[in-house]
Amino acid sequence: LIFYSAVFGVLSRRGGHRCKEGESMNAALRRDADVILRSSLNAVLPDEAVRRALRDLRPGKGRVLLVAAGKAAWQMAHAAVETLGRVDGGVVVTKYGHVKGEIPGVTCYEAGHPVPDANGFAATQKALELVQGLTAGDTVLFLLSGGGSALFEQPLVPGAELQDITSQLLASGADIVEMNTIRKRLSGVKGGRFAQRCAPAQVFSIVLSDILGDPLDMIASGPAVPDTSTCAQALAVAERYHLALSAQARALLAQETPKTLDNVTTRITGSVRELCRAAASACRNLGYEPVLLTDQLCCEAREAGSFLGSIVRTQAGQGKKLAYIAGGETIVHLTGKGLGGRNQELALAAAPAIAGLNAAVFSVGSDGTDGPTDAAGGYVDGDTLAALEAGGWSGYAALQNNDSYHALKAVDGLIITGATGTNVNDVAVALIGEKTPPVSPEVSPEW
């Protein structure tokens, strides 16, 4: 199911959709989901946010250089150069497939994510060469978005070892704060070290947040922010997840990062809170009564899906359209060998609870990427469980094998957007149609 293309149009449909003759009762919910996702993602595209933040820029009398890193780096850099008119040089490093064209005065690179690669190392080196030898009158415009931890990297251990440590962290179930606490100490640019390399030039940093609570030193591992994490915390993370580390890596974890920086001004723009509010507004425009459950969701993906499914069952039967919205970033502990992502797992886990109901649950990553797949997330409704069983699929077995991608693909439940140009965590929505009857609380199926 392709809900929308990578180029978004502004939608303003109101009142929701009604089922057409001969359609499943959930067909209208699927169309509503399309509108909600379009509207939500349009609201957090970085272009206008960058333009607003640049109103506070007071460049010195010297050169203005641009460095942008992350999944939204190209869009942020494009908006910045359009706004400023020109820059005296620049480097963009973003994920493969995310460069949309040339930007005057700026060299664009694509690199690996979520595991860093040689292209990212080379692009980061170009950025470091760009900011060498600056004066106090120069200004570095630093545009940062999620994904920068992998894309913007100068490893202090051999590149292959850094890739292995990153893969260990991704598979461990460590949250993003724990992961970045380790990454900072193995890098020549993270944890405030990039800003140190720019001194004495002033760094004006615009940050698109992809971490709950917007902790600046953790977004893309904080290349231009004093680090609040400690060596003791880094060593504790390594111990907690039994990371296999070389003696060199362990020694780096014991070295402190910069705790003060006097050459940086930071503006944060865009967050999961804005994404959730936009989803609520879109739901309201379609005739739903929206409830924002949280914008700090950070549990296991399948638990979040089961929770949303249980809300549907307990709130069904009110004779009106209801929407429950949760934003954040769930985690997945990899135990199987299948293919999927946290948003796909969340959606699939909700399927048994809403089976047979006029209801839907969908979850999407705002950057258009969910795990190592071409999908942004997943969609299920009251018809999904029956469709899986008719196709010979066990949803439970798919979850146990972390194979939500293939299960959802079999029932037309993948959400595919392509690169969206933004990155502000994930949003999950449960929709309850007005045709849903009351459900007995004693019957609550789950996998």
Task: Specify the residue positions occupied by each region the protein language model found.
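Internal gly/pro-rich beta-alpha loop/helix module
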Residues: 158-244
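Internal helix-turn-beta structural module
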Residues: 348-435, 447
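A glycine- and small-aliphatic-rich helix-loop capping segment at beta-alpha/alpha-beta transitions
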Residues: 79-89, 103-108, 128, 132, ...
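Short beta-strand segments
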Residues: 67-69, 91-94, 141-146, 205-211, ...
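Short, Lys/Arg-enriched N-terminal segments with co-localized hydrophobic residues
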Residues: 2-7, 11-24
